[in-house]
């Protein structure tokens, strides 16, 4: 089958009775047939090698069809039409060095980054076999440079890990605590195995996108590649969609560009609408922290959806991942679910009132109710923002004692949620130190007068 495909690609550009338009139509539909045949017949390494052959065969055939004279190497910004990137923006062209790196295995040592490789529309593959056990990127060169600076060695979290993996009923593989875990304990610190720019994930033509996935995965060491491929999902695209965590890469003078990071160890944690583990991503590194005390044998969970959504919406979003939510809240008595939704509506209303500075809809005690509802609802990973609003509200009413008390609570929770050096944590420490000097001091008390 593959020999036939390659023969067609070699012969079509040379056929004197075909117009250029007919050549292009034949070559356009060929990649899908070739992609299907090698995807279901050959393993990853052989598949990538065959895709290299296809890519080079197409480049050579297209060039010979366009001109009888020897083709000169073009500048990196220009390139002749190529059927593998049909209907996409103009690609970055292949220089002689690019072709050499594309066809041959990376010649660089394992102590340095390889790439850019296989660039399409400014999106390229980068990899490092030794960095944090192996990492691959599918992104632009400028964002790859930033991420490469991010990817420092990490300590891995608690040693030995206070959890183990096992099959959990109705959920598949999950993690359970092997000993009691205290609130705030760092469980895992992991660098990503694969990082994909959101734009490349969503906008590249499927055949080109999947080829870049295969090349990136093939660049990983076997243990990292196996860990990625054993995640839930039909194919690489589905595994990224199901198991990745989004973060933003900030270049100079630009808004954050969304990227999807795959962390196979962290992805083993199942969903719960009231999770006991919180995570934060800093410079592409994910840190997981116990958001409350966890008993031995208890499952470790994170939330895959916005925990402030009503139960019906949470369940609908969970179904998009191909499973039903099996958490205690969603599977519990209906009256408890109804009560939970009522608390969530009240939380949303109080938040709006606390943020409303045009109308006096709150009292000094509103913040107390707001934080109490978070605690009752089990929103442990969001107590920092709740205490922050309460502390600011007390400051607005000129209540020094309780403003300081809630600011200290907020700083403690925010240190867990966002990190001890986060701007929000420092802001609350500043409020606790001198409430009277804060810009909010007494503002609502003045309005009351």
Q: What are these model-predicted stretches?
A:
Residues 185-274, 320, 326-329:
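Catalytic cores of histone-lysine modification enzymes
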Residues 2-5, 15:
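Cysteine-centered motifs
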Residues 9, 85, 99, 125, ...:
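Secreted/processed peptides and extracellular or luminal domains of membrane proteins
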Residues 18-20, 27, 39-42, 61, ...:
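Residues marking helix boundaries in flexible regions
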Residues 260-405, 412, 426-429:
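C-terminal SET catalytic tail plus cysteine-rich post-SET Zn-binding segment of SAM-dependent SET-domain
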Residues 2-3, 30, 34-183, 401-449:
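Accessory low-complexity/Zn-finger-associated flanking regions
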Residues 8-12, 21, 44:
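Acidic, Ala/Val/Gly-enriched low-complexity intrinsically disordered segments
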Residues 139-179, 183-206, 267-290:
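Conserved AWS/pre-SET-to-SET junction and N-terminal core of the SET lysine methyltransferase domain
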